[in-house]
A protein has these predicted regions:
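Histidine-acidic metal/acid-base catalytic patches
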Residues: 1-7, 14-28, 103-105, 159-178, ...
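Active-site acidic/histidine proton-transfer and metal-coordination neighborhood
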Residues: 19-20, 56-59, 78-178, 275, ...
């Protein structure tokens, strides 16, 4: 039975320096991580800090599987304003360089802005801007030997539904671009029952978190209302060969957070085992 690698996003410690949490993450049994780019955690503008983070990751024998690109109100690669768009691309490319310096292989990006209620008349223009911006970013990632991965966003935002993700994927010239399925986002959009099948040919990664259906709680899988067995059955049926990254909140102390991550990892493996046993 193929075991999906299950790692942990350091985003659960986004308010804590990466230098102050990695040893605890490793001690909890996680040797594969996604790196959070929140400035208080790891400032990708500070290349001395980036280099030191890479050294520590290697010392701890951790696999830096992925790096989450920065996202904030001031970063908008779809903006009608070319100055804002250029600045946003520059920030993301800088983060991609930081990821490459650390030895990361996958660079996860929210392809749209972190703003809701954008004027409908701007939609097509913004979609075209996103395609042009992502083409530039994909080229930079290819030169850095890092794979660009697009994440489905929350339903009230651009690229919050599979149709938008598939459109932008088709508009990107590079064929070496994948998709990261965020289960929490897909559950809130109502797309989770069908999204695995729709995106299956392009799925490289899976951000796993749970919620109670009304907000993006980032609970450990199994702690919310998501029905995980159908999701895992679809992933297994379609021979998903990527990696699962637990993207849970850090609202508790480090010990409680890591206990939740360990419990979630066991939960996913137990569900997968039941699914595969039922097919024998």
């Amino acid at each position: 039975m193929f075991e999906w690698p299950i790692g942990l996003s350091t985003g659960c410690f986004y308010r804590t320096s990466i230098f102050d949490c990695l040893e605890e993450v490793r001690a909890a049994g996680f040797n594969l991580i996604e790196i959070c780019s929140f400035p208080a955690h790891l400032d990708y503008h500070d290349f001395d800090a980036v280099k030191r983070a890479g050294e520590l990751i290697r010392q701890l024998n951790i696999d830096p599987y992925s790096f989450h690109a920065p996202f904030a109100d001031h970063i908008d690669i779809t903006s009608p304003d070319p100055t804002i768009r250029s600045h946003s691309i520059g920030e993301i490319v800088l983060a991609a360089n930081a990821a490459a310096e650390i030895g990361v292989r996958h660079f996860v990006i929210h392809p749209g802005p972190e703003k809701s209620d954008l004027p409908e008349k701007e939609r097509l223009h913004r979609m075209e801007n996103a395609a042009n911006s992502l083409n530039q970013i994909a080229e930079e990632c290819a030169e850095l030997d890092v794979v660009l991965i697009l994440e489905n966003m929350l339903p009230h935002l651009f690229f919050g539904h599979p149709r938008d993700i598939l459109w932008i994927l088709g508009a990107i010239e590079s064929t070496d671009v994948g998709i990261c399925l965020d289960t929490g986002h897909a559950h809130l959009s109502g797309d989770l029952p069908s999204v695995v099948h729709k995106l299956s040919r392009h799925l490289w990664m899976h951000h796993a978190s749970d919620n109670c259906g009304d907000r993006d709680d980032h609970l450990p899988p199994g702690d919310g209302e998501i029905l995980w067995e159908p999701v895992i059955r679809q992933l297994s049926k379609l021979s998903f060969g990527g990696t699962i990254i637990l993207e849970i909140n850090g609202n508790s102390d480090a010990e409680t957070t890591l206990d939740g991550a360990q419990r979630a990892r066991r939960f996913i493996r137990d569900v997968k085992r039941r699914v595969e046993d039922s097919h024998r």
